[in-house]
Amino acid sequence: MKKLASLQFFNLKLLLNGESSRGFSKFKKNYKLKAELGRGGFGVVYRAVRTCDNALVAVKFIERSNVKEWARINGEQVPMEICMLAKCSKVRGVIRLLDWYSIPEGFLIVMERPYPCIDMFDFIKGQGKISEDMARFLFRQIAVTVHECVQNRVLHRDLKDENIVIDLVTGSTKLIDFGAATVLRRSQYSDFQGTRLYCPPEWFLHSLYLGREAAVWSLGVLLYNSLNGRLPFRNEKDICTAHLLGPLPFFVPVSAEVKDLISKCLTFDPFQRCSLEAILNHPWVKQQTLSWDALTKNKVQKKTSESSDDHHSETLGDHSETEEDRSPPTSSVSQQPGSADEGVGLSASSSNTHNQKKPNHKEFRMAKTSLLAPPTSIEMKAAVQASKTPTQFNVHTALKNQRQIKKHHSPQPPNSTVLTALRRAMSREAQNRISGVFSQD
């Protein structure tokens, strides 16, 4: 993929320097093309620098063969994306169109590039999920932007977290990628070019795509995703049948007001769905929110507090994981980090570990610590670390640590009691992995 991207970037540079682009040398005089920023279904976006003031910009290249819909600006035929960006030039929450150039092979669209910024997908992914106050701070801006676009008769048609960038300094949001955008009309649309998991059920069931109603649905999906760190639907079947299963599950504690707003946005019947104006006037959206500086400061303080708590409970966590390693393989698989139920699953397993009675484990642990001579804390830590380690590289590291421990300690006669306790501290799975390492050596 990297080779393909670099090849396409090289081809674009050849294109700008070739015979076919001599009539459009103005772009090369005004901008210096850099590396690729990203790509989507409608084009490729590159970094660029404006030569007159060294301002950072983004340049999107669209091939003529990939243009699905055309419009006219001053009598010249251009992709609909350029026309829609021009119509939204005064909308604060839309990425600003700076210039555009027509070349025989396609079009170059020059846009502002907020810096430093991150798209909402990466922002949510980096945080797992965001607080309700921060979600309100961002969602309110997005809803206002979508409403103002509609006021200018522009329908984006691809509202999702990847098409929203967040300024990390101010917290302001910008709606990007108008490749699927079109003129808003009252009648239904016969085509859909956006992301299917953000698409309303009426499109899958009846090929019915209504502009405003579909935008409201996408906003509901976006808000749910920002709070839960996951999309509400896995596939088209979920989208079309979720209303039969009752209210959507929430995996974090949220207020009744935001649940009410999401349920109104994700109403199955498009004609019963709330309007964009109703979203902006909803009590949850109108509720006063902290500033971006205060929100980010609270997030940093919370992370610091959580890391401190993790440090104090490190020993307890090691013992808990040792017990979990003794459980059947199915339970360990269900609690792997990175799974869909990571936040809820881990907290549930933690509470079960402390609340459920485990007489066998408890008696075994009592015998190990009171009746037998226990291994040293350093040896126990190395053993537990080896039992937790999923990869061969970390097993080597644990073994190396054990060898270093033996070097620093004076040689002692073998103690069968200590060896027995150490073996019990390590799971059978870890023993097999370590045996495999020794066999390779």
Curated annotation (Swiss-Prot):
Keyword Transferase: yes
A single GO molecular function term of this UniProt record: protein serine/threonine kinase activity
Reactions catalysed, as given in the entry: L-seryl-[protein] + ATP = O-phospho-L-seryl-[protein] + ADP + H(+); L-threonyl-[protein] + ATP = O-phospho-L-threonyl-[protein] + ADP + H(+)
Compositional bias annotation for Polar residues: 328-338
Active-site residue numbers: 158
InterPro entries according to UniProt: Kinase-like_dom_sf, PIM_Ser/Thr_kinase, Prot_kinase_dom, Protein_kinase_ATP_BS, Ser/Thr_kinase_AS
Top-level taxon of origin: Eukaryota
Pfam families: Pkinase
SUPFAM superfamilies on file: Protein kinase-like (PK-like) (SSF56112)
Its job: Involved in the negative regulation of synaptic differentiation in PLM neurons.
Name the UniProt record assigns to this protein: Serine/threonine-protein kinase prk-2
